[in-house]
Every structure is written in C-alpha cells, then in structure tokens.
Amino acid sequence: MIKSLNKYLLVMIILACSSGGSSPTDSGDDNGNGDNTNPYELPNAVDYGLSNQVEIVTWNIRQFPQHSSTKDYVKNLMEKWDADIYFLQEMRSESELISMVNSMPNYSYVFDEESGNLGFALVYKNQYVTFNSKNELWADTPNNDDGDSDYANNASYQFADRPPMENYVTWSDGVKTINLYLIGIHYKCCGDDSYDAN
C-alpha cells in the first residue's frame, strides 16, 4: 500500500512540475546558424532506453499545431525520445494529433473532453501500456457560466477552466506490471480578475 502511494505521489509530482515553456516547433529552413542542418536531427533529445522502467514525458506543447511543420517536428522528437507515455497539454487540434499518432506505429491516444480548444492528450506505446480508463477531475463542479451555452449543465472547473485529466493505465514489460494513475494539471500562466478570484 505504501509503495503504491509513493509511486502515485511521484507521478503526481512529475506531472505537476513539468515545464510549461513554449515549444520550438517552427523549424524553418535551417537551425539559425546558416549551415542548413536538418532541423529534425534533435541532437539534445535523449532516448534513455530504459526497458525495465516506465518512461513518461509531460509537455505543454503550446497550442498544437502552431505551424505547418509542427506535426513533423513533434513526431520526430517523440520517436527520438521513444518514451512509453506522453502526456500533452494545449491540444488545439485533435484531428492533427490523431493524424500524427496514426503515422507512428504502435502508439495510441486518448483525449480529454472538457478542456475545450486547449485540451489534454495521452499518447502511449501499445507494446507496454494498456489504457484502462480516464476521469476529468471536478469537471462537474457548478459554475455560473462555463461558456458552452448549455445552461442546464454549467460545469466549469474553477481552476483555469481546465479540469485535471486522470488516466488509469497499466504498464508492463513482460516481467513486471505496474498500475499507474497519471494526472495532468494544466496551470494557468497569467492572471486576470476572474481567474485571480478563483
């Protein structure tokens, strides 16, 4: 019980503390040094190759896709990292992500349903990960108006209008199996009067 709680807390801390910086997804024609290096070589992206451990990447991808080259850039980076699970924030276009993931063999995806145009996506490697279920925490918390014109169900999570996305998955490498609850929290970066009150 304590080990499970420790794993759960570790995953929560990792997801909560992930960087929310902008994504350098406009590759342009060169790397800015004038040497026309392939922008998708990604020399600083590391595949740790840890076959006996769960590899999770969280990424505020910043309004995916931002540019015409975003899908190719992100796909190349994810393939280079070769992680088991990617928890992405600010998915502006589900269809673009679906197209990208469908071009990546052995990966699947799950989207949230309550975050609107800047939602969550869970992308995972089928070889190691089994998706069991998802839950959008506090998505049914009442609010005056959540902006969806459905006044019978004004259910806007009070924190930045983005309910945390909880996913229950099972990771297995054939030797060991780990059940994980992954919770993505998309913090609001900038305040205003209405958000500051919450």
Regions found by a protein language model. Name each.
Residues K3-V11:
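Sec-dependent signal peptide recognition
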Residues L15-S18:
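C-terminal motif of bacterial Sec signal peptides marking the signal peptidase cleavage site
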Residues P24-N198:
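Divalent cation-coordinating acidic motifs and surrounding scaffolds
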